[in-house]
């Protein structure tokens, strides 16, 4: 009996934590998917989504062991009492007018909005510390987020996960439109993935190909979700999304055909061993069985049909966990070829899109204008508009005008928070009803302020960026969607769940603006210094030379033998001597 005890302890020691995992199922899971969509303009959009779900209450349980969920983000949730966190880095602009509505759009630059728990006493302090920590994690300039570019929206940004209340005091939102996205931001983003970039869909994340695109956006979304149908407990969901748009005419030598290797310079070799689901969706909505206009190779595992963003879509599904899909060739290169060139038809116009511009002349006054387009033939719907304007553009609120079809359009809800010089920006939120088949113009005049010479950014003649407008709306759908199980549906269809199948939620962003401010001639001090130093050096040098130089009078020397002979000859000729 005594000899059996050490043997039992040795067995438990050898099993370690893995032995206990045999009795208890894993509390976390990973799903990954790639959606490839040929756009109406001829470009190709690729959207990656990696969802890590952890059945744990991080703020109540003393978590010390992390398996799939990144430890760096898990500690942020616990330390700063986060309810939700949404961070995105975007290079380029999503052209909604030509590409259609995206699954998840983000503004140019960096965007961060966070919901804190109601137990946080000093939200501003936690917000500042959190932005500094995220700046270090993602190698970004998020440390430039301060009170001058932070606002607290009251209606535009609702929690995407579970929320008992919506006290907007615990919400913070900021945008850095000047932020430049590069590989330094992509590398830490990939390291958060359970398989990094070694296996699964993440092997396609090759930096030189991802940044050689018309549009690049990567994001991190953290939110609490229900663990079961009754929602008796919560789980934490981490979504890492990456969207890129390839120019098919450049990558395909003038053709609309595409393949994984042509776009990413890599192919899929093996699934991620930690993923419970790994799929590739290819949009084949334009496929016609009678005409057979396109061909997808290799044959897909199955097909999927659903109403996505108000349009019925058909997708070819490639299941990477299917052993017959990759093991046969150890190389999965999905290709789409057009058997005959597609007809050059005008791309369908989305029901909602917008654009923004600045007008005026001179460097004193100007006007901000936003055009909201509702192209639905017979349905009107409301749009929530959010504008964040820097403090150095002083808005004239009495000049705010909203017109639709030549008539005044009064907003049903308006919230305005004036700016304070060097402390906080302007915040303007409005709920506007867009008539059917109309263009609504929202304009407001402003005056440029004079900055201190220390407040100008590097290269001030380039201009100062103004954050884009944010549009949130429930757009009517042309096709009624059936209620689906959000846990079983694809990831690209479950970020904004809407119970009403006749509408779908979209959040769009306009272009960031570039405004010129009265800028002093920063080269003038340099010119003055150079001129002053030159004049002083020349004048002082001359006077100093005269005051310190010693002058000596030299007596003329008598000439030598040659000179005396020359003088004798000159005298003989009657010429004055030398």
UniProtKB/Swiss-Prot annotation:
Glycans are attached at residues 164, 291, 327. The chain crosses the membrane at residues 526-548. Pathway: Glycolipid biosynthesis; glycosylphosphatidylinositol-anchor biosynthesis. Changing residue 157 to V: In MCAHS3; uncertain significance. Changing residue 360 to V: In MCAHS3; decreased function in GPI-anchor attachment to protein; reduced amounts of GPI-anchored proteins in homozygous patient cells. Residues 1-21 form the signal peptide. Changing residue 396 to A: No effect on function in GPI-anchor attachment to protein. GO terms for cellular component: cytoplasmic vesicle; endoplasmic reticulum membrane; GPI-anchor transamidase complex; membrane. Disulfide bonds join 195-272, 226-231. Changing residue 527 to H: In MCAHS3; uncertain significance. The keyword DNA repair does not apply. Changing residue 291 to Q: No effect on function in GPI-anchor attachment to protein. It is linked to Multiple congenital anomalies-hypotonia-seizures syndrome 3: An autosomal recessive syndrome characterized by distinct facial features, intellectual disability, hypotonia and seizures, in combination with abnormal skeletal, endocrine, and ophthalmologic findings including impaired vision, as well as abnormal motility of the eyes. Heteropentamer. Part of the GPI-anchor transamidase complex, consisting of PIGK, PIGT, PIGS, PIGU and GAA1. This is GPI-anchor transamidase component PIGT.
């Amino acid at each position: 009996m005594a000899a059996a005890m050490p043997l039992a302890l040795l067995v438990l020691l050898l099993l370690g934590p893995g032995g206990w995992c045999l009795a208890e199922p894993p509390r976390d899971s990973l799903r990954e998917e790639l959606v490839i969509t040929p756009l109406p303009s001829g470009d190709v959009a690729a959207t990656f989504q990696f969802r890590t779900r952890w059945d744990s209450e991080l703020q109540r349980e003393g978590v010390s062991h992390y398996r799939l969920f990144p430890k760096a983000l898990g500690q942020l949730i616990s330390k700063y009492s986060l309810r939700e966190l949404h961070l995105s880095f975007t290079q380029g602009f999503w052209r909604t007018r030509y590409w259609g509505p995206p699954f998840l759009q983000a503004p140019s630059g960096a965007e961060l909005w966070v919901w804190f728990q109601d137990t946080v006493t000093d939200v501003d302090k936690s917000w500042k510390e959190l932005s500094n920590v995220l700046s270090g994690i993602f190698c970004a300039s998020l440390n430039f987020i301060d009170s001058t570019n932070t606002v607290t929206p009251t209606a535009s940004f609702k929690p995407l996960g579970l929320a008992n209340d919506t006290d907007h005091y615990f919400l913070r939102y900021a945008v850095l439109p000047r932020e430049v996205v590069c590989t330094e931001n992509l590398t830490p983003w990939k390291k958060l993935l359970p398989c990094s970039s070694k296996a699964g869909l993440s092997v396609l994340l090759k930096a030189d190909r991802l940044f050689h695109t018309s549009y690049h956006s990567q994001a991190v979304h953290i939110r609490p979700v229900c663990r079961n149908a009754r929602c008796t407990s919560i789980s934490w969901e981490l979504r890492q999304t990456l969207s890129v748009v390839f120019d098919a005419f450049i990558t395909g030598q003038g053709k609309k055909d595409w393949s994984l290797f042509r776009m990413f310079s890599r192919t899929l070799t093996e699934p991620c061993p930690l993923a419970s689901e790994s799929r590739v969706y290819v949009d084949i909505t334009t496929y016609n069985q009678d005409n057979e206009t396109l061909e997808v190779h290799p044959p897909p595992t199955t097909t999927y049909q659903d109403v996505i963003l108000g349009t019925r879509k058909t997708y070819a599904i490639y299941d990477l966990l299917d052993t017959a899909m990759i093991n046969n060739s150890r190389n999965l290169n999905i290709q789409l070829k057009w058997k005959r060139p597609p007809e050059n038809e005008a791309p369908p116009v989305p029901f909602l899109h917008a654009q923004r511009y600045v007008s005026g002349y001179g460097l004193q006054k100007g006007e901000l204008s936003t055009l909201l387009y509702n192209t639905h033939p017979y349905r009107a719907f409301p749009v929530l508009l959010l504008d964040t304007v820097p403090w150095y553009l002083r808005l004239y609120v009495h000049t705010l005008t909203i017109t639709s079809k030549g008539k005044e359009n009064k907003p049903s809800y308006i919230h305005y928070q004036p700016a304070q010089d060097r402390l906080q920006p302007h915040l303007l939120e409005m709920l506007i009803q867009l008539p059917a088949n109309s263009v609504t113009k929202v304009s407001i005049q402003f005056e440029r302020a004079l900055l201190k010479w220390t407040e100008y950014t590097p290269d001030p003649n380039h201009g100062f960026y103004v954050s884009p407008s944010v549009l949130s709306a429930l757009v009517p759908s042309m096709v009624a969607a059936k209620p689906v199980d959000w846990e079983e549906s694809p990831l690209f269809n479950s970020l904004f769940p809407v119970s009403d199948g006749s509408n779908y939620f979209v959040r769009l962003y306009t272009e960031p603006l570039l405004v010129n401010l009265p800028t002093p001639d920063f080269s003038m001090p340099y010119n003055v210094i150079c001129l002053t130093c030159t004049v002083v050096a020349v004048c002082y040098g001359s006077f100093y030379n005269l005051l310190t130089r010693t002058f000596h009078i030299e007596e003329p020397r008598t000439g030598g033998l040659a000179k005396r002979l020359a003088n004798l000859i000159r005298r003989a000729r009657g010429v004055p001597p030398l």
